[in-house]
Amino acid sequence: MEKILVTTDNSANSRSAISVAIKLARQRKSELIILHVYHLLRPFAWSDHAFSEYTDTFRKKTEEELGSFIEGIYEEIEESEINYQLELVSNIDVVHGVLDYAKKHNCSYICISTRGAGTMKKLFGTHTSKLISSSPIPVLCIPSSWQLTELNHMLYASDMTDHQNELKKVVEFAKPIGASVTMMHIAFPDEFLLDKDLAEATLQTEVDYKVEVLTPERDFTYTLMEEIENAIKLYNPSVLVLFTDRSRPMFEKLIFGSNAEAYSFYGQIPLLTFNKERKK
């Protein structure tokens, strides 16, 4: 059975991600795992026994608090069937804890809440951006302010370097929840483009799903992310899909950044990111 992993820090900021994950798990008939990663500092003077007892007490209290918190979310979104698995994992690094668990248990998607980040946060990174840049598993980022609505329209922004394979992954997410798919390629002025009707017919044959194709011309008065933001305002999708290249050299990442990571800082709609497969 497919597994959806959603993270929580037991704060109101994680409500949006948990709400979306609950709905997705029901729609996709997936197993829902809610994960809390924690790290306890051990005082030097404590014995092994004392620290073990403290850890047990902490875990029991946290499980009770999270159980009440999660059941409250089920009630808020009017999901009568409460069905999830709660996991607590100890790890000094939250991102490593999430990825280790997700890989070990073959999770299909990781769902996480995200907030806007200030300058210092951008400099040192956030859990969301670190997950996006390092996860081999697709990451669904839900803005903490997101009001729960159906994920029924996916806008896939493509650079057209591997769109056939990437589109299959997008459709694999969209099909079980009945979401429409639009593939958008922001084209350079001198770029050759296929006829829209022919491209849509070809893609429908390749992925066995209806795909709308948009090819707006690149406007160099805007950054690429600003153009994507403009497209979001124009076409009103419920999910933006981006593919991020984890194999890019570190210097290139520092200079140019990642569109997916950049969007996670200020995006107003859910963002689904996949690891871009590098052609050999």
What are these regions (language model features)?
Residues M1-S52, H153-R218, N230, P237-V239, ...:
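Small/aliphatic-rich secondary-structure junction motif
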Residues S52-E65:
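A short acidic, glycine-rich active-site loop
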Residues E75-Q85, S90, V207-T215:
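A short helix-to-beta-strand connector/capping loop
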Residues L86-G97, T221-M225:
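Charged docking surfaces used in two-component/phosphorelay signaling
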Residues Y101-S108, K233-P237:
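Glycine-rich phosphate-binding loop signature in dinucleotide/nucleotide-binding domains
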Residues I112-K130, L242-Y266, K280:
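Glycine-rich, Arg-bearing micro-motifs that act as flexible, cationic patches
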Residues I112-T114, P138-S144, P270-N275:
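Short beta-strand elements of ligand-binding domains
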Residues L123-T126, P138-S144, L148, M160-V171:
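Active-site glycine-rich loop that binds ribose-phosphate moieties when present
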